[in-house]
């Protein structure tokens, strides 16, 4: 990540390269790339470029059923390499994550969505059966009437305390029971667990894949965490919950914080499998 200060605002340049080299020439199936900031990103995106290797390819920009940008790639010739090179320039002006209004009907939790909205949110309300550990976790959630913001802050922070973070290279998402049993998970594991928790509590929620940009502070904190020692960017996952009047609000259970300017969503979907950064197949080969 490169940093550029422009007239008291901070612009960051993110470069993200995924590169595969094969041991033989292979045919590539059509690929889908979900590495363009989503239309609803609260962080202003100033520029975006996508470069694909091999150069002989066809690209068709689309939006999926959930409004996310995706690039569908078709490769007419066999190749020994495949790369996706993304560059994003974003304006990192500080965002107040609580800068929204909530409809009076949803001002306090618990609340119900009206019938028409509930139909529209149906894919984001589907739950997986709650196992023993998830049921026990949900049973400890207070049901007293409380401001919806306060409820979500407490829920997100509780999950952050309960699940330790780990880098997990295996593909896929852990089952909620496994994440709770281990008290350990990657960002995508904890994000999916939070999605299921919110849905079991009657709140529409979706899985988010995106970039997390963390910048060093100008001065070290005197009474709290000082943040990262160096500017840092990585692929990350978090959750979004739907609040009437406010729309989709990001919650990051890895940090226990609401999503801010450093959270740049790429794909927001009912299921994690629909948010994979790159989808596609090749002929049998070694990579």
Task: Indicate residue ranges for each PLM-predicted region.
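Glycine-rich, flexible loop/turn motifs
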Residues: 22, 96, 107, 161, ...
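Secondary-structure boundary elements
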Residues: 107-185, 193, 200, 272
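Hydrophobic/aromatic-rich core segments of domains that either
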Residues: 157, 189-285
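Acidic, mature catalytic/reactive cores of soluble proteins
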Residues: 2-4, 153-154
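A broad, low-specificity signal for short, low-complexity segments enriched in glycine/proline
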Residues: 9-13, 42-51, 166-168, 199, ...
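Short N-terminal helix-initiation segments at or just after the protein's N-terminus
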Residues: 21-33, 171-180, 236
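Linear, non-domain "peripheral" regions
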Residues: 3-139, 145
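A short, charged
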Residues: 122-130, 277-287
């Amino acid at each position: 990540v490169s940093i550029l200060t422009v007239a008291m605002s901070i612009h960051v340049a993110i470069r993200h390269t995924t590169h595969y080299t094969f041991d033989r020439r292979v045919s590539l199936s059509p690929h889908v790339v979900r590495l363009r900031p989503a239309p609803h990103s609260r962080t202003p995106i100033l520029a975006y470029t996508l470069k694909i290797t091999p150069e002989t390819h066809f690209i068709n920009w689309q939006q999926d059923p959930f409004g996310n940008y995706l690039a569908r790639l078709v490769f007419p010739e066999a190749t020994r390499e495949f790369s996706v090179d993304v560059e994003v320039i974003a304006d990192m002006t500080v965002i107040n994550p609580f800068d929204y209004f909530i409809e009076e009907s949803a001002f306090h939790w618990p609340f119900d969505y009206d019938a028409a909205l509930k139909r529209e949110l149906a894919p984001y309300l589907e739950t997986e059966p709650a196992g023993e550990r998830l049921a026990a976790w949900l049973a400890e959630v207070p049901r007293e009437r409380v401001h919806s913001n306060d409820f979500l802050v407490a829920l997100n922070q509780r999950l952050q305390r309960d699940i330790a973070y780990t880098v997990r290279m295996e593909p896929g998402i852990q089952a909620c029971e496994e994440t709770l049993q281990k008290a350990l998970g990657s960002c995508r594991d904890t994000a999916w667990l939070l999605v299921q928790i919110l849905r079991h509590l009657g709140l529409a929620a979706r899985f988010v894949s995106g970039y997390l940009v963390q910048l060093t502070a100008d001065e070290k904190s005197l009474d709290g965490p000082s943040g990262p020692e160096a500017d840092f960017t990585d692929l990350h996952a978090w959750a979004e919950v739907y609040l009437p009047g406010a729309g989709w609000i990001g919650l990051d259970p890895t940090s226990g914080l609401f999503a801010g300017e450093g959270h740049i969503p790429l794909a927001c979907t009912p299921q994690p499998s629909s948010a994979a950064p790159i989808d596609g197949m090749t002929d049998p080969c070694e990579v």
